[in-house]
Each structure stands twice: as structure tokens, then as C-alpha cells.
Amino acid sequence: MAELVRVAVDAMGGDNAPEEIVKGCIMAANDFGEIITLVGKKDIISEHLKKAGYNGDRIKIQNAEEVISGDDEPTTAIRQKKDSSLRVGLDMLHKGQGDVMVSAGNTGALITGATLIVKRIKGVRRVALAPLMPAETGCFLLVDGGANVCLLYTSPSPR
């Protein structure tokens, strides 16, 4: 039997969090059976689990009292909000307490935190975003490798 994947989820990041995040994690736990750790404000998450009627053993809670908002500057937030749901989830991943980390929160903070805390694989210089996108026939992987502009030579402005 295959080993279960341990998924750390930033329960406080994203639109309509944590309620919609908790609902989605309940669906995932029921459908896929993975071990999910919701990272965020324990009392609020517990309330949403209870409200949804969840009483299974596949969802755990890791308390984190701070939240990184979409308005926070990524590097500052990762460095200063050490008890944020995003930072604690990345720390769990780095320490081997999870196999996967998912967040719908501040993308810049997620990429910055992953780079500073979890680190890149040797030989990888730049990260890429790779979300699964729904399609009529299932889903597809969309890779955003970013764009780099290289100025090869300079010339006088055409003005």
C-alpha cells in the first residue's frame, strides 16, 4: 500500500479563508484520504471543522497566530511574521513534517518563503509557478516560467 502524502495547507491565505479552505480540505480528505494539516488560527479552524460536521482523523491543525495578507511585502512578511500560517507551513515542509505545502495566499510571499526556507533543488536557478487548471477533459498543468528581458546592446532612443 502506498504511503499517504502529508499535505500542509495555509488555512488563512486566500479569498474567503479559512471557511472555503477548510471545506476544500474536508472534500480532499474524504475523496483522496491524504493526511492534511491545516495551518492557521486553531480556534477558528476548529470552529469551521465543527460547523461542517467533520469528525474524521485525516485533518490535523497546526496553530499559527499571524496571517500574511495580499498587501504585505513578501520578503518583509516572511522574515517578520514567523508565526504566520504561510511561514509555519513552509517551516513544516523544510523540517520534513510535510511532503507538500499548498497556499492560496500571497503568491510573492509563497515564492519568496519557499526560496528562502525550503530552498531550491541544486541546479535550479529560478522557480516557476505550475498550477493545475481545469479543462473539459480533466485538467492541465500551466507553467509560468516568467520572462527575462536581456538587453543585448544599447542604441540611441528613437525619440
What is each model feature region?
Residues Y153-R159:
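Conserved small/polar residues in nucleotide/adenosyl-binding loops
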Residues G113-G145:
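Short, acidic/small-residue loops that bind anionic groups at enzyme active sites
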Residues V67-S69, A147-C150:
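A short, flexible beta-alpha/helix-coil linker loop
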Residues C139, C150-L151:
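C-terminal extensions
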Residues M1-A104, A109-T115:
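Contiguous, glycine/small-aliphatic-enriched amphipathic segments in soluble metabolic enzymes
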Residues A17, L151-L152:
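Secondary-structure boundary/capping motif
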